[in-house]
From Swiss-Prot:
Cross-referenced Gene3D superfamilies: 3.10.50.10, Glycosidases (3.20.20.80)
SMART domains the UniProt entry points to: Glyco_18
Taxonomic path: Eukaryota, Metazoa, Chordata, Craniata, Vertebrata
Residues the record lists as binding chitin: 71-72, 98-101, 142, 211-214, 355
Pfam families, per the entry: Glyco_hydro_18 (PF00704)
Name of the protein this chain belongs to: Oviduct-specific glycoprotein
UniProt source species: Mesocricetus auratus (Golden hamster)
Sequence repeats: 490-504, 505-519, 520-534, 535-549, 550-564, 565-579, 580-594, 595-609
């Protein structure tokens, strides 16, 4: 206890008084009151001065309209919740709709047409104003997954834009402050890529609650922390990784709120003697006394558990865990929350989101540190501004505690980067630097399982760390990918632009040029690419000449290389004979025999690797029997517009299937 108070005091002295208005958004659940006493919590038990925004979870949906989950919520909990604003006039309250148990089917039905979305939006404006809420939070887990069709990814965007438009219109007509709009989103990369257009979400929402927790749990076969701040070499999932992933995909940093869980995830150990991080486990530990959910302990239940448990600190992840017998819990405490809050400030994110306020030690009954010990430290570090600042140490993530972590001692290999060349580091780290790294002084490479710990540093230096990962790709080839570990850096984070496949090396120069090992591909402008041994030249924007062949564009529809016919449908899909060419927007092209897929300007996939691209329009031209006619097979028609109009026309939300098929049939007849 003494160590904690001393440490927190030092953190408060270091807290920068930078004048930045951080958000501290706290969820409150409508089932918190149903827990046994003394864990039963009502809105009246909350401190209205701790959080800048309170979100009531959850409302429901019926017949494409927002509704209360039950009569008690509407008649008792809503009024109590919004009455907190009488004590703190600056407090904002929002109502969240959805949640994990809500599923996806009602969202899908509501999103499916413009008419059903308009019905929902009309009910939302009326419902929020009637009950005194200041905004809506969308908790849709997840568009395009868990039974939700992939079209929901784009219909969800339409809903958000239409909600924003309706909120602005209502504010103008009533002369009241505009209703706020937020969303809870995943922190897992494959879900982010599938479910969201990050750039457009970032433009439309007032703030984004990143669920940077539930990264590990009893559904896995070994122990892992629920919400580590930083990644381990063999496991990139972490709060920092999730936040940087969203930022690097185009979300404004000041709208991104990092998720802080006021709970832990538990495991049942396979062997009592193997009790560290990544120890073998078999399902969840026993349910908590009050939450009664296997694999889960609220923070106040964690406090009771650790009184008789062995506690440890995870180096490089800045979070604690504890075990007792065969029961293991990875949790957060005031110290780990402090590290995470300082990370939010250091990286200039928008603030913190807490799930949930009612799982903190609300009355100070369990943990002995007063009421709301977790949220209180976030309030001190992010909201209050009366503490003077002193400079932070250059590497402040170095608190010595009882620590543990996999891997060996640090084995750094450093190469200087020049300012005018792309530097490929020597074998040993199998790492490479791309143009995006040139803003940094050094790139450090380490072997798998190693850590980088800056030592003896007395003056500011900036490092980026590249880590080798191996995975099996199609065709029994080994794929080596390189990840940049943002947790070891002191400056802005960057994303990986370059990967190696098999024995080849690919170097990305900006977003334009790719070099696979043994071949050189050069982009001329934005339209022309030169693979090794061939030259492809763009004449204007319409005509392409590969080495030895001539390709002529007739209008915008057809291109004829020597002896073959290529058809362009709109601006989206190009189909040469026997090959499939897929264009996502203007970014992704698949030449025959190889796949080069660029998603936005973030990732490059060399030959031999699987690439999952959503919302593609793919067409294949093939010979049919002995006839010389060419049949076109339509595989998918799901390319949405990159930009969404203020009032999108329902006819423009997807390609017109009938017209496209008619064009295809006409082409087949012309042969």
């Amino acid at each position: 206890m003494g160590r904690l108070l001393l440490w927190v005091g030092l953190v408060l002295l270091m807290k920068p008084n930078d004048g930045t208005a951080y958000k501290l958004v706290c969820y409150f659940t409508n089932w918190a009151h149903s827990r046994p006493v003394p864990a039963s919590i009502l809105p009246r038990d909350l401190d209205p001065f701790l959080c800048t925004h309170l979100i009531f979870a959850f409302a429901s949906m019926s017949n494409n309209q927002i509704v209360a989950n039950n009569l008690q919520d509407e008649k008792i909990l809503y009024p109590e919740f919004n009455k907190l604003k009488e004590r703190n006039r600056a407090l904002k309250t929002l109502l969240s709709v959805g949640g994990w148990n809500f599923g996806t089917s009602r969202f899908t039905t509501m999103l499916s047409t413009l008419a059903s979305r308009e019905k929902f939006i009309g009910s939302v404006v009326s419902f929020l104003r009637t009950h005194g809420f200041d905004g809506l939070d969308l908790f849709f887990l997840y568009p395009g997954l868990r039974g939700s069709p992939i079209n929901d990814r784009w219909n969800f965007l339409f809903l958000i834009e239409e909600l924003q438009f309706a909120f602005e219109k209502e504010a103008l007509l009533t002369q009241r402050p505009r209703l706020l709009l937020s969303a809870a989103v995943s922190g897992i990369p494959y879900i982010i890529q599938t479910s969201y257009d990050v750039h457009l979400l970032g433009r439309r929402l007032d703030f984004i609650n990143v669920l940077s927790y539930d990264l590990h749990g009893s559904w896995e076969k070994s122990t892992g922390h629920n919400s580590p701040l930083f990644s381990l070499p063999e496991d990139p999932k972490s709060s920092a990784f999730a936040m940087n992933y969203w930022r690097n995909l185009g979300a404004p940093a000041d709208k991104l709120l990092m998720g802080f869980p006021a709970y832990g995830r538990t495991f049942h150990l396979l062997r009592e003697s193997k009790n560290g991080l990544q120890a073998a486990s078999m399902g969840p530990a026993s349910p908590g006394k009050y939450t009664k959910q296997a694999g889960f302990l609220a923070y106040y239940e964690v406090c009771s558990f650790i009184q008789r448990a062995e506690k440890h600190w995870i180096d490089h992840q800045y979070v604690p865990y504890a075990y007792k017998g065969k029961e293991w819990v990875g949790y957060d405490d005031a110290v780990s929350f402090s590290y995470k809050a300082m990370f939010v400030k250091k990286e200039h994110f928008g603030g913190a989101m807490v799930w949930t306020l009612d799982m903190d030690d609300v009355r100070g009954t369990f943990c002995g540190n007063g009421p709301f010990p977790l949220v209180h430290i976030l309030n001190e570090l992010l909201v209050r501004a009366e503490f003077n600042s002193t400079p932070l140490p250059q590497f402040w993530f170095t608190l010595p505690v009882n620590s543990s972590g996999p891997g060996s001692e640090s084995l750094p290999v450093t190469e200087e980067l020049t300012t005018d060349t792309v530097k490929i580091l020597p074998p040993g780290g199998e790492a490479m630097a791309t143009e995006v790294h040139r803003k940094y002084e050094k790139v450090t490479t380490i072997p798998n399982g190693g850590f980088v710990t800056p030592a003896g540093t007395t003056s500011p230096t900036t490092h980026a760390v590249a880590l080798e990962r191996n995975a099996m790709a199609p065709g029994a080839k080994t794929t080596t990918s390189l990840d940049l570990l943002s947790e070891t850096m002191t400056g802005m984070t960057v994303t990986v632009q370059t990967q190696t496949a098999g024995r080849e090396t690919m170097t990305t120069v900006g977003n334009q040029s790719v070099t696979p090992g043994g071949e050189t591909m050069t982009t001329v402008g934005n339209q022309s690419v030169t693979p090794g041994g061939e030259t492809v030249t763009t004449v204007g924007n319409q005509s392409v000449t590969p080495g030895g062949e001539t390709m002529t564009t007739v209008g915008n529809q057809s291109v004829t290389p020597g002896g073959e016919t290529v058809t362009i449908v709109g601006n989206k899909s190009v189909t040469p004979v026997g090959e499939t060419v897929t264009i996502v927007g203007n970014k992704s092209v698949t030449p025959g025999g190889q796949t080069t897929a660029t998603v936005g300007s973030q990732s490059v996939t060399p030959p031999g690797m699987d690439t999952t691209l959503v919302y593609l329009q793919t067409m294949t031209l093939s010979e049919k029997g002995t006839s010389s006619k060419k049949a076109v097979v339509l595989e998918k028609v799901t390319v949405p517009p990159r930009e969404i109009s203020v009032m999108p026309n329902e006819q423009n939300t997807a390609l017109n299937r009938e017209n496209l098929i008619a064009e295809v049939e006409s082409y087949s007849q012309d042969g």
